[in-house]
Amino acid sequence: MTLIIYSLGMVDNYPFHLFNGFPNLYGFSGLDRRSVERDKPNWKKKLLNDPNTRFVLNWRSKSLISEPTLGYPSAVKLKLEEIPPNLEATDQYVFLGQKDALWYVGIDISTVDEFELNKGLPEDSSFRDLREVGAILDRFDACILSYCRAIFYWQQNNKFCGVCGSKTAISKAGHQI
């Protein structure tokens, strides 16, 4: 890394002190975001029918977390058949990427009423804010949940064009407005 920076003549500008700090838990985790897959019009149909797809649920900026009696919390990554029927009605999907032959898709279920929310979910799970549990999650879990939350937050706060005021449309598997 240093050799490349020296050859570019950036020695005085490059923040070498950043290499000495703690790693960003929400940063790189090995997830391949597969931008080529986002352009495909049938991405959703393909991934919904793939047994290697895992879904992470996002409800009002909170993530579904498994909290076992013993051990550390972890992200709940569900197969399609494990998602309760009352949560499948949403059309808010975002393709997150692929890692170790598994595809990851985020689902925003914020429109689901709080009383209907926990029906059919794993017993030891609940929706938690990442600020409460993010630091003790596995790095991959923290990364994928924060990435999912960030995309849905971005979508929710950009429903209308900042220039003309018209309603925006989400495309490219949730990554473009």
Regions found by a protein language model. Give the residues of each.
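N-terminal alpha-helical interaction blocks
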Residues: 8-137
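Solvent-exposed, flexible loop/coil residues
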Residues: 131-134, 141, 156, 172
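Generic signal for short, ordered secondary-structure residues
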Residues: 127, 139-143, 158
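Aromatic-residue detector
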Residues: 56, 105, 142-145, 162-163, ...
